From Swiss-Prot:
Protein name: 3-dehydroquinate synthase, chloroplastic
Keyword ATP-binding (UniProt): no
Record keywords, A-Z: Amino-acid biosynthesis, Aromatic amino acid biosynthesis, Chloroplast, Lyase, Metal-binding, NAD, Plastid, Transit peptide
Gene Ontology molecular function, alphabetical: 3-dehydroquinate synthase activity; metal ion binding
Enzyme Commission number(s) from the entry: 4.2.3.4
Function: Catalyzes the second step in the shikimate pathway.
Length: 442
């Protein structure tokens, strides 16, 4: 079942972002059930009520049903989802034209010095607009920028040093603010630089890809890759705010857009069945970049992510469930070489493998397997790993996965009806071996 999916073919492989269409112990076995809408805590019976009430939706959401034709988005008051972490809580602003609303960014700047970290693809599109948003009506603020090469293959210590070099050469002090302008790679590296520079400085996320907007910019995971494993070096470090200007998706290549949808689909599978069913009905609108549909999908994804992070910031339990498909997927990214497959593409293939293993364990029925395959295909994502991956490659790479404890690989698997999952190391090894053999060469 190895994949013939080719990076140079489908609208689908790393953060080759915008081009104009031109160690805390984790419990061994955590069962999680998350029913229906995140925005209605009273209807959710799978989480502790105290935890669910933490999620604050501070503005009106996008229309839920997308049967009508799309309407042109324009600058307006953003939807706001808050990540509740006590004194370190922060808002996620979501909407069109937000980079044209300077106050949203300026209220979160510390001091008078700002360093914008971006890449060679995003800089020509949005760097000037971002600098204007940071300085408009605020002449006391000075902005430096560092433009990094674009791609997952550059998410390493050598590239990270360029950020530190610029900060030190510019003599930035502890009251400066780092701003991440780009996709997940830029957000992860800028966040890690902010966590490390002078032992921690202010940090703002401006994600410009679907992947970053619905997942990586929220929750404070920062870091870089190591040749032996993805995201092995990093820190938990929360931003002051996340500003999601949905207009930035207008310049996102189709392949990058599809990659981000893998994380959107994940939320529905592990904790939000209603959202998954909505995606099944509205995937064509998402692929067509319908602004109303996309705003809703981003908002709903951020609500799910914020809810989990507010309960388990440092992944000591329930937050691990957000890694559905990631253990197999990270093995693919590492095995084929960083940058060959996009993160979402690898996660999609990994999700199919996790679902296959869940079925082999007798935890889900065939109909759910088929629904997962269908929605990923609709999203133009791969449903099996590349042909070059072998069983031994999977095993050796997954042996150093961050979720390994006491020599046991723990996985996120589906169990029961749609929207239910389990994070566990208590499974029949035979099922894992059978899945690996089914999807890769011996």
């Amino acid at each position: 079942m190895a994949s013939s999916f080719c990076p140079k073919q489908a609208l689908s492989f790393t953060n080759s972002t915008h081009q104009l269409h031109q160690s805390r112990a984790i419990p061994r076995d955590i069962h999680v059930r998350f029913p229906a809408p995140v925005s209605s805590p009273s209807s959710r019976c799978g989480l502790k009520s105290k935890a669910t009430t933490r999620l604050k939706v501070l503005a009106t959401s996008a229309t839920k049903v997308m049967d009508h034709s799309s309407s042109k988005a324009s600058s307006q008051a953003p939807t706001v989802v808050e990540v509740d972490l006590g004194t370190r809580s922060y808002p996620i602003y979501i909407g069109a034209g937000l980079l044209d609303q300077p106050d949203l960014l300026q209220r979160h700047i510390h001091g008078k010095r700002v360093l914008v970290v971006t890449n060679t693809t995003v800089a020509p599109l949005y760097l000037d607009k971002t600098i204007s948003a940071l300085t408009d009506g605020n002449p006391n603020v000075t902005v430096e920028s560092v433009i990094l090469p674009d791609g997952e293959q550059f998410k390493n210590m050598e590239t990270l040093m360029k950020v530190f070099d610029k900060a030190i050469e510019s003599r930035l002090d502890r009251r400066c603010t780092f701003v991440a302008l780009g996709g997940g790679v830029i957000g992860d590296m800028c966040g890690y630089a902010a966590a490390s520079y002078l032992r921690g400085v202010n940090f703002i996320q401006i994600p410009t890809t679907v992947m970053a907007q619905v997942d990586s910019s929220v929750g404070g995971k920062t870091g870089i890759n190591h040749p032996l494993g993805k995201n092995m070096i990093g820190a938990f470090y929360q931003p002051q705010c996340v500003l999601i200007d949905t207009d930035t998706l207008n310049t996102l290549p189709d392949r990058e857009l599809a990659s981000g949808l893998a994380e959107v689909i994940k939320y529905g599978l592990i904790r939000d069945a209603e959202f998954f069913e909505w995606q099944e009905q509205n995937m064509p609108l998402l692929l067509a970049r319908d602004p109303t549909a996309f705003t809703y999908a981003i908002k709903r994804s951020c609500e799910n992510k914020a809810d989990v992070v507010s309960q388990d910031e440092k992944e000591s339990g329930v937050r691990a469930t957000l890694n559905l498909g990631h253990t197999f997927g990270h093995a693919v990214e590492t095995g084929v070489g960083y940058g060959q497959w996009l993160h979402g593409e690898a996660v999609a293939a990994g999700t199919v493998m996790a679902v296959d293993m869940s079925r082999r364990l007798g935890w889900i029925d065939d109909s759910l397997v088929q629904r997962v395959q269908k929605i990923l295909q609709q999203a133009k994502l791969p449903t099996s790993p590349p042909e070059t991956m072998t069983v031994e490659m999977f095993k050796s790479i997954m042996a150093v996965d961050k979720k390994v404890a006491d020599g046991k690989l723990r996985l996120i698997l589906l169990k029961g009806s749609l929207g239910n999952c389990v994070f566990t190391g208590d499974y029949d090894q035979k099922a894992l071996d059978e899945t690996l053999r089914a999807f890769s060469k011996s």
